[in-house]
Swiss-Prot record:
GO cellular component: cytosolic small ribosomal subunit
Keywords: Ribonucleoprotein, Ribosomal protein, RNA-binding, rRNA-binding
GO biological process, one term: translation
Gene3D superfamilies: 6.10.250.3130, S15/NS1, RNA-binding
Role this protein plays: One of the primary rRNA binding proteins, it binds directly to 16S rRNA where it helps nucleate assembly of the platform of the 30S subunit by binding and bridging several RNA helices of the 16S rRNA.
Pfam families: Ribosomal_S15
GO MF annotation list: rRNA binding; structural constituent of ribosome
Recorded superkingdom: Bacteria
Quaternary structure and partners: Part of the 30S ribosomal subunit. Forms a bridge to the 50S subunit in the 70S ribosome, contacting the 23S rRNA.
The name this protein goes by in its record: Small ribosomal subunit protein uS15
Organism field: Colwellia psychrerythraea (strain 34H / ATCC BAA-681)
Gene that encodes the chain: rpsO
InterPro entries assigned: Ribosomal_uS15, Ribosomal_uS15_bac-type, uS15_NS1_RNA-bd_sf
Keyword Zinc-finger: no
Length: 89
């Protein structure tokens, strides 16, 4: 349930800070959020898929770490990102 190249390129273009930016926390969090949202649909149909659930939990933890890093570095960018992605915090 990974993203195809066009979806990934669209997300990178939307959240990149500059041309060719693929490693900024905003881009990484946006990609992880999209993958997490795709997997939520998978788990509605496959409730007992515990192996994939472990991968989902790793993605959620990685996203949390990146958000904490961004919050420590620049609170304004953090607030803008969670508002744009519709995350709870």
């Amino acid at each position: 349930m990974s993203l195809n190249a066009t979806e990934k390129a669209a997300i990178v273009a939307e959240y990149a800070q500059s041309e060719g930016d693929t490693g900024s926390p905003e881009v990484q969090v946006a990609l992880l959020t999209t993958q997490i949202n795709h997997l939520q649909g998978h788990f509605k149909a496959h409730i007992h898929d515990h192996h994939s659930r472990r991968g989902l939990l790793r993605m959620v933890a990685q996203r949390r770490k990146l958000l904490d890093y961004l919050k420590g570095k620049n609170v304004d960018r953090y607030g803008a990102l969670i508002g744009k992605l519709g995350l709870r915090r």
